[in-house]
Amino acid sequence: MTMKIRAIVTVKGLVQGVAFRHHTVLQGNQLRVTGWVKNLPNGDVQGCFEGDETDVQALVEWCHHGPSRARVDRVIVERKSFRGEFDTFDVRY
């Protein structure tokens, strides 16, 4: 049985204005991960990802490079207990 996890992910660098959130949603849906992603006022992007550990980890790994126009300088991951509170993966504003 695969363990389910939650990860709070903060991505730093040139990650706003480059479709990072849109592509994160596409990747999340492809991986069957649920949660959200949003822009932060300081220029970072933050997400909450839930799902099978291998799928969440794959999305976190994708965040280390993001879409082609992004420049990722750092990814901070806080691993949390799975809550199962999301049915979809979407952009929050």
Curated annotation (Swiss-Prot):
InterPro entries: Acylphosphatase, Acylphosphatase-like_dom, Acylphosphatase-like_dom_sf, Acylphosphatase_CS. The keyword Hydrolase applies. Keywords: Hydrolase. Pfam families: Acylphosphatase (PF00708). Residues 6-93 form the Acylphosphatase-like domain. The active site is at residues 21, 39. Its EC number is 3.6.1.7. PROSITE patterns: ACYLPHOSPHATASE_1 (PS00150), ACYLPHOSPHATASE_2 (PS00151), ACYLPHOSPHATASE_3 (PS51160). GO terms for molecular function: acylphosphatase activity. The keyword Hydrolase applies. It is an enzyme of class 3 (hydrolase). It comes from the Bacteria. SUPFAM superfamilies: Acylphosphatase/BLUF domain-like. It catalyses: an acyl phosphate + H2O = a carboxylate + phosphate + H(+). Belongs to the acylphosphatase family. This is Acylphosphatase. The gene is acyP.
